[in-house]
UniProtKB/Swiss-Prot annotation:
Enzyme class, broadest EC rank: hydrolase
Subcellular location: Secreted
UniProtKB keywords: Carbohydrate metabolism, Glycoprotein, Glycosidase, Hydrolase, Polysaccharide degradation, Secreted, Signal
Gene behind the chain: inu2
Binding locations of substrate: M41, N42, E43, N61, D176, N320
EC number of this enzyme: 3.2.1.7
Transmembrane parts of this sequence: none
The reaction(s) this protein catalyses: Endohydrolysis of (2->1)-beta-D-fructosidic linkages in inulin
Protein source organism: Aspergillus ficuum
Active site positions: E43
Consequence when changing Q59A: Impairs catalytic activity
Membership in a protein family: Belongs to the glycosyl hydrolase 32 family.
Protein name, UniProt field: Extracellular endo-inulinase inu2
Amino acid sequence: MLNPKVAYMVWMTCLGLTLPSQAQSNDYRPSYHFTPDQYWMNEPNGLIKIGSTWHLFFQHNPTANVWGNICWGHATSTDLMHWAHKPTAIADENGVEAFTGTAYYDPNNTSGLGDSANPPYLAWFTGYTTSSQTQDQRLAFSVDNGATWTKFQGNPIISTSQEAPHDITGGLESRDPKVFFHRQSGNWIMVLAHGGQDKLSFWTSADTINWTWQSDLKSTSINGLSSDITGWEVPDMFELPVEGTEETTWVVMMTPAEGSPAGGNGVLAITGSFDGKSFTADPVDASTMWLDNGRDFDGALSWVNVPASDGRRIIAAVMNSYGSNPPTTTWKGMLSFPRTLSLKKVGTQQHFVQQPITELDTISTSLQILANQTITPGQTLLSSIRGTALDVRVAFYPDAGSVLSLAVRKGASEQTVIKYTQSDATLSVDRTESGDISYDPAAGGVHTAKLEEDGTGLVSIRVLVDTCSVEVFGGQGEAVISDLIFPSDSSDGLALEVTGGNAVLQSVDVRSVSLE
């Protein structure tokens, strides 16, 4: 038997790939975030729970580490953390790639693609014809609980000629179907994104196959939305309870290509009303509509078919907005850690709030706990802790004018610094010394989000650290910053410090995270 390390080097050489540097021994693969077993991944697709199994589909190139040959990759999990890689679910074939889409259960077999004893699961996706670069909408179905998928023989279900009256490019920019059953109207609803036209279109169907255009949601019809927010993609749509009330509201979530707080792609969400044909947006607040202020939260979608007994709206996105530039050689693209999304009033404003799913607690072990301790300028806490996969929680009362800093993945010349600046109520992530930032002009820098103290003056920060990422949740989850980082293996330290005044640490809990 060939030595595994030698076999790996031979395999890499045969593929023409560069070996990871000695400073990074495992190609930056994360410890507890999902990555494809190899090659390219971008945004998640068709997120659905079937029985006790969570299904993750994702945009995947199964043959190379760059975008292209796009199909639906597939993985399953019973806890959203331990993932089993599965064969390709929806392949690219006959010159048609399988772009982004969504999945849904058809319990009454309205599609006719199953039967009453075994209703089908349906997946809608954009078919991208490489020769013409046109995009149409297609359907696949599963009658074995999502294990395998068959393309509908009558594809496309919305052709480019049908799209053309509602798409000024004639079908070059109609993609990413979000489909769900609208109980109130008794119809199936499809939401399509129209890229550079900065609009969504809404379609209805009685049978999931034959579709009729109903309306457009344009940027000009959303009061308060900046004209700089362009290139709409990857829509999601769902009802969300407003915590503390008996009300629900409709939410549209999407990913503009430009205009996000950190530059480039970002995910925003807007509330409004939906009558089964058209969505009327509430006026937006630029300070609360972005779900993430970091650079690396792109193409978010939510899991559907989650039992009411669970009740959570769980979302995830791809953490990569640099194309094929990141310095990984055997894989590209990783899934953000799944997070819950809810809507509640924080202070005087209504916010979307997000938190890592509670399942994370089952794979974490406490390394150090501090309580009711004052940290003063010149002190450094947590410096004895080492780790590259951590869940760090800090709750503190900052003095006026103080700055609390938590350095993670800290080494001799590398660190990623999470700061809270009391004077302007700002949470920030500083990647300027985070490791390798040479791969892309946008790879370094400082990303910020507003985070007010609560009514008692308390500030809460939670940081998920993994091999090549940080995800920072401030307050109740109203301020979130997600970023990729690429430090050396040896940069595994922590440091908690304060300048400009003291901070009273109500609690500090540092946990190691492991899937093993």
